């Protein structure tokens, strides 16, 4: 292990040494702790990767499933899909780390400590604002066929998946994170698209209750896009 002190030095001392001492592939960076992780598909086997845990609660995965794989900065949910896991959408249980030679789900480790704290902080922030603002569903168009696919934005993970898709000019149907689809799949009917999850009115076209202009749930401190950089700068100001 890179640090032999009583505490793992990562920003503001993320984890104690004994919490990580039996984990495989531990590496301590300037503002993160990195460990070996993976996800198992019954068809493709184990996809191995490296998980970085940041004090902000952000989780970032660099895939090493094959020597030529260049997938990095994946959310756990995106890595779960990339690995070919058949029962997706349960990344806390499906993505694992090696502890004492055994595969242990992330949900049973200390590695989600700051992620969970961040989620609770966002919930408290929303409650303090009256919990009146939510994130409605958004659509992202395929660069190949032009069909629009629905993204839910109810959690930080879901917001990050949509954020990444919006920032990718070459995004296509096969990149859809929730289901394996192709351009052959029909898009939602127009009559269905009007329902986007507004708590005030089911067919709302956008109001102060469902349109967010930036919060801790949908902006990311490690993202370098101008929108996130501006939000992070304003929060620190």
From Swiss-Prot:
Indicate the transmembrane segments per the record.
none
Tell me the first and last residues of the signal peptide.
none
Q: Which InterPro entries match?
A: Developmental_reg_ULTRAPETALA, SAND-like_dom_sf, SAND_dom, ULT1/2_SAND, ULT1/2_Znf
| Primary location class | cytoplasm
**Molecular function terms from GO:** DNA binding; zinc ion binding
Tell me the keywords, alphabetical order: Cytoplasm, Developmental protein, DNA-binding, Metal-binding, Nucleus, Transcription, Transcription regulation, Zinc, Zinc-finger
GO cellular component term, pick one: nucleus
Task: Summarize tissue expression.
Answer: Expressed at low levels in seedlings, roots, shoots, leaves, stems, inflorescences, pollen, flowers and siliques, with highest levels dividing tissues including inflorescence.
Ranges for domain SAND come to 18-116
One GO process term, biological-process aspect = negative regulation of flower development
Q: What happens when the gene is disrupted?
A: Delayed flowering and higher floral organs number with extra petals and sepals. Increased H3K27me3 marks but decreased H3K4me3 marks on target gene loci. Plants missing both EMF1 and ULT1 have rescued normal H3K27me3 marks and H3K4me3 marks. Plants lacking both CRC and ULT1 exhibit strong floral meristem (FM) indeterminacy with reiterations of extra floral whorls in the center of the flower associated with reduced AGAMOUS and SUPERMAN levels.
* Zinc finger map (CW-type): 133-191
Family matches, as PROSITE patterns: SAND (PS50864)
- Coiled coil segments of this chain: none
What Pfam families would the database entry show?
SAND_ULT1, zf_ULT1
Q: Where in the cell is it found?
A: Cytoplasm; Nucleus
Oligomer and partners: Interacts with HHO5. Associates with ATX1 for trimethylating 'Lys-4' on histone H3 (H3K4me3) at flower MADS box gene loci.
Protein function: Putative transcription factor that acts as a key negative regulator of cell accumulation in shoot and floral meristems. Negatively regulates the size of the WUSCHEL (WUS)-expressing organizing center in inflorescence meristems. May act by down-regulating expression of WUS. Acts as an antirepressor that counteracts EMF1 action through modulation of trimethylated 'Lys-4' on histone H3 (H3K4me3) marks on target gene loci (including genes involved in salt stress response and flower development).
Name under which the protein is recorded: Protein ULTRAPETALA 1
The lineage is:
Eukaryota, Viridiplantae, Streptophyta, Embryophyta, Tracheophyta
């Amino acid at each position: 292990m890179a640090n032999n002190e009583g505490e793992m030095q990562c920003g503001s001392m993320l984890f104690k040494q004994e919490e990580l001492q039996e984990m495989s592939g531990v590496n301590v960076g300037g503002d993160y702790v990195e460990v070996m992780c993976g996800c198992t598909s019954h068809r493709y086997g184990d996809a191995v990767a490296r998980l970085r845990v940041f004090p902000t609660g952000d989780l970032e995965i660099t895939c090493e499933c094959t020597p030529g794989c260049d997938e990095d900065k994946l959310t756990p949910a995106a890595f779960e899909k990339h690995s070919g896991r058949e029962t997706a959408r349960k990344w806390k249980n499906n993505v694992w780390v090696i502890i004492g030679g055994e595969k242990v789900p992330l949900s049973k480790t200390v590695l989600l400590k700051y992620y969970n704290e961040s989620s609770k902080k966002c919930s408290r922030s929303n409650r303090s604002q009256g919990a009146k603002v939510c994130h409605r569903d958004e659509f992202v168009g395929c660069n190949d066929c032009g069909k629009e696919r629905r993204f839910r934005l109810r959690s930080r993970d879901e917001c990050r998946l949509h954020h990444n898709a919006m920032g990718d000019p070459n995004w296509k149907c096969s990149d859809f994170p929730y289901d394996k689809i192709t351009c052959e799949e029909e898009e939602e009917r127009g009559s269905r698209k009007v329902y986007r999850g507004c708590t005030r009115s089911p067919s709302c076209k956008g109001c102060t209750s469902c349109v967010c202009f930036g919060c801790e749930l949908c902006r990311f401190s490690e993202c370098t896009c101008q929108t996130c950089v501006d939000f992070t700068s304003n929060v620190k100001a």
